[in-house]
């Protein structure tokens, strides 16, 4: 495969991933904005209350400022999903937490749960943010696409010298999902993860039901 063709294929996979994440990204932003709206409405009611001496209203205004700053941070985080910052670094633990939360936006409807085992040495390992986010979230989405029905997803980190491994496995669960499982947009597979991994020079392997991503640990 020519390099240009490989880039086109990788970009096509990235588009599929973003389409799948659209609901989670929207819910993330709406949750932050609804908090601001709620505080603003409470503050307005306090201002209409003649018995209020103004102190509680000032408290609500201060809370709105805090909520707005949190919303700004969330917006920046969402923008990074759309256009990753070149050379940005994150920890494996942080990346896993963000990716599982975002990819698992509809897991309650699928009766799917994730169990994360992240020892401190692995969780604190610094790795490329763009590679980690892209590969972890794509791996999780591929697991749910390839294993319809309720799942128990195991995510395990392990420090391996100058690299850190992330192992993912999906096990069928006996929990009954409230709704029938369905694939959003297009199904992703391990071959899609492997193609993106090659674009980031990340080693990826598969042994039976277990998939492994090996990230290079970056200097602090």
PLM regions and their residue ranges:
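The cytosolic transmitter module of two-component sensor histidine kinases
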Residues: 14, 18, 29, 53-57, ...
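Glycine-rich ATP-binding loops of the HATPase_c
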Residues: 198-213
């Amino acid at each position: 495969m020519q390099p240009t063709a490989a880039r086109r294929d990788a970009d096509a996979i990235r588009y599929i991933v973003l389409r799948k994440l659209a609901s989670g990204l929207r819910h993330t932003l709406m949750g932050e904005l609804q908090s601001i709206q709620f505080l603003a409405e409470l503050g307005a009611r306090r201002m209409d209350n003649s018995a209020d001496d103004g102190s509680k209203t000032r408290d609500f205004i201060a809370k709105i400022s805090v909520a707005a700053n949190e919303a700004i941070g969330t917006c920046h985080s969402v923008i990074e999903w759309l256009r990753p910052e070149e050379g940005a670094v994150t920890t494996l633990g942080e990346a896993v937490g963000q990716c599982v939360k975002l990819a698992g936006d509809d897991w309650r409807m699928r009766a799917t749960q994730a169990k994360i085992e992240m020892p401190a040495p692995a969780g604190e390992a610094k790795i490329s943010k763009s590679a980690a986010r892209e590969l972890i979230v794509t791996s999780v989405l591929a697991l749910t696409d390839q294993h319809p029905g309720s799942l128990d997803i195991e995510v395990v980190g392990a420090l391996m010298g100058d690299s850190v491994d992330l192992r993912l496995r999906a096990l069928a669960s006996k929990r009954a999902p409230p709704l029938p499982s369905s694939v959003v947009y297009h199904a992703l597979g391990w071959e899609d993860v492997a193609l993106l991994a090659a674009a980031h020079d990340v080693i990826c392997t598969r042994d039976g039901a277990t998939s492994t991503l090996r990230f290079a640990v970056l200097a602090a």
